């Protein structure tokens, strides 16, 4: 899929690499995600070994430099969105858990220091799943992602972190958490929290359809962090982080909705009433058609946003 230019029209045809990835992702979504999604949701837990299987797809290691053990490939928001869409067709919660470490990796590549990249990124290149996540949302009705109320204060030898984050994916077990907080007298900043330091608590959250995601509320009560926990030099570009996060969620939503539409089409063609499939009823057919129209609009808006992000445009 190509970005628009003055020389050619906007091209929505997937390139060879994207088509190859599509085959891989759709096969994985069918055989490894959808096949276990229902039982996993009812059990409220991810199947054993599932995330290590997703690690074999290499989604997190692809953009990591070769010097750190990765593939050293360029990052393409369009391709990332396509991959997320194809996987989410299988199940939204399992896919979101699988791709959550990508946000951590990409943010480190974007805004981390060389020392932080060298310290953390090689872990993602060992062939096993690394539970890494980002913590942005906060438990209040008026939450504004650009104005976090979780605070960080400079103290001797580091920072003191206080506040709460909610709906953190993989929050129950994540070994690395990128916490967005308001740095005193500076503005929004990001901090890398390893493990569960003193003063940090994790509380599981259960939400319909997301029970396998290990969502949790993370509370920080004067958690002491070292100096090098501050991401980069402290000048965190929160708007870029939020924009790319929203783009990823949009792609996941498109894939999930495509899965719903495919299910509905099969159902209305198989369900028989008064001697014929209910899809023959115009009222039903119109509803399904409206779903397809809205879904295609969602997809095209997401692809356009990904294309703009790939060009560095707003």
Name what the model sees in each region.
Residues 1-17:
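Intrinsic disorder at enzyme termini
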Residues 34-45, 265, 269-277, 292-314:
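C-terminal helix-coil-helix/basic helical segment that borders enzyme active sites and/or dimer interfaces
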Residues 150-153:
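A structural signal for short hydrophobic beta-strand segments in well-ordered beta-sheet cores
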Residues 56-129, 169-176, 309:
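Internal helix-loop-helix
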Residues 73-83, 144-147, 219, 224-225:
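Structural signature of FAD isoalloxazine-binding scaffolds in flavoprotein oxidoreductases
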Residues 10-14, 21, 202-297:
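Glycine-rich beta->alpha junctions and the first turn(s) of the following alpha-helix
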Residues 162-203:
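A short core secondary-structure module
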Residues 127-137:
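A short, Trp-centered hydrophobic/proline-enriched beta-strand micro-motif
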């Amino acid at each position: 899929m190509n970005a628009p230019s003055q020389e050619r029209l906007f091209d929505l045809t997937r390139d060879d690499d994207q088509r190859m990835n599509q085959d891989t992702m759709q096969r994985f979504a069918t055989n490894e995600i959808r096949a276990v999604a229902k039982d996993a949701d009812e059990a409220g837990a991810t199947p054993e070994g599932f995330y290590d299987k997703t690690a074999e797809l290499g989604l997190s290691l692809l953009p990591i430099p070769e010097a750190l053990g990765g593939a050293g490939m360029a990052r393409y928001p369009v391709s990332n969105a396509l991959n997320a869409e194809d996987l989410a067709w299988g199940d939204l919660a399992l896919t979101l858990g699988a791709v959550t470490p990508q946000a951590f990796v990409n943010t480190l590549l974007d805004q981390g220091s060389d020392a932080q990249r060298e310290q953390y990124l090689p872990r993602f290149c060992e062939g096993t799943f690394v539970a890494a996540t980002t913590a942005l949302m906060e438990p209040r009705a008026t939450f504004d992602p650009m104005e976090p109320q979780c605070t960080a204060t400079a103290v001797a030898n580091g920072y003191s972190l206080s506040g709460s984050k909610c709906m953190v994916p993989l929050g129950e077990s994540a070994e690395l958490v990128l916490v967005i907080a308001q740095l005193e007298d500076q503005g929004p900043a990001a901090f890398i929290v390893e493990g569960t330091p003193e003063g940090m608590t994790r509380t599981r959250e259960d939400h319909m359809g997301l029970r396998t995601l290990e969502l949790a509320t993370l509370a920080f009560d004067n958690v002491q962090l070292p100096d090098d926990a501050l991401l980069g030099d402290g000048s965190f570009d929160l708007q870029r982080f939020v924009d790319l996060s929203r783009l990823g969620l949009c792609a996941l939503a498109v894939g999930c909705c495509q899965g719903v539409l495919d299910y509905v089409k099969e159902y209305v063609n198989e369900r028989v009433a008064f001697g014929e499939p209910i899809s023959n009823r115009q009222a039903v057919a119109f509803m399904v058609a409206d779903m397809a129209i809205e879904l295609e609009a969602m997809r095209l808006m997401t692809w356009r946003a990904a294309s703009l992000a790939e060009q560095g445009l707003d």
